[in-house]
Amino acid sequence: MITAEECRTYKEFVDLYQSYLYPLLGARLSRMYSPKNKVIIDMGTGPGYLSIQLAKRTNAHVHAVDINPAMHEIAQEEAKKSGVSSLISFDLEDVHHLSYADQYADFIVSYSCLHHWEDVVKGLKECYRVLAPGGKIVILDTFNPQGSHLEIMRKQIKEPEYFRFVREAFEESYSFEDIHQFVQDAGIPNYSLETFHFLPEDFIESLDELEDAPLWEQNDQSTDHEIESVTWMLTIEKEKEGAL
C-alpha cells in the first residue's frame, strides 16, 4: 500500500496527465449501465474521479471502494468539490473479502486497479458474487506494452516521480492470455475481452469537460492513443434469473 504522500503525488500525476480520461470513461461506462437497484461499485477508486463521473451521469448510488484510507481522504475532498457527496459512499474494502451481500450491485467497474490485486481469481469471484443477475462488471487495465510504447510515454511524462506510476503499472500488468485464464479459473461463463478504444460518442458527450482538462488543448491527443493501445477491457455479464 502506498503512503499518504505517495497518494497525493499520484493525484498530482493524474490531474496533470490523465484528468481528461475520466469524462471519457464516465461517458462510455454510463452508457453500459442498466439500472435496477441503482447501485454501482467503483473498485479501486483512487482519487475518486471515476466515481464522481458515474454519480453525475447515472444518478445511481456509487460505492467508491479503496483499501487505502489516504486515497479515500482525497476522493472525499474531490466529491465534495464536485457536489456529489450525497451520491457516493466511501468504503474501505479489500476486493478479496468484500463485505457486500450477494447480488448487491447492478454495475461494478474498475479502472487501472486489477494489476494491484494479490489474487486476481479470488477478486473476480468476489465481484461476481456481489453482482446482481442481469448486471455487468467492466474492468479496464493495462497489458505489458511491446516495442516503443513505454519510451514514448517516458518522453511525454518527464517527471520521474510521476512516470514511476506508469512504469509500475506496466511491470505489474497481465497479458490477454493471463486474463482469459483468470476469468476461466474463477468459473465465470459469460465474458468478453478486447483491446479498449474510445468511441466518437465518448468525446461528443465529454466536450465541455475536455475543454477544461490540462494538456487537452495543447497536445495532439497522442497520449490517449498510447493509453488505448495498451489497455484492455473485460466485460462480464451475469445472466438474469430464469434466463435460458
Curated annotation (Swiss-Prot):
GO terms for molecular function: methyltransferase activity; S-adenosylmethionine-dependent methyltransferase activity. InterPro entries: Methyltransf_11, SAM-dependent_MTases_sf. It comes from the Bacteria. Gene3D superfamilies: Vaccinia Virus protein VP39 (3.40.50.150). PANTHER family: METHYLTRANSFERASE (PTHR43591), METHYLTRANSFERASE TYPE 11 DOMAIN-CONTAINING PROTEIN (PTHR43591:SF109). Belongs to the methyltransferase superfamily. This is Uncharacterized protein YxbB. The lineage of its organism: Bacteria, Bacillati, Bacillota, Bacilli, Bacillales. The gene is yxbB.
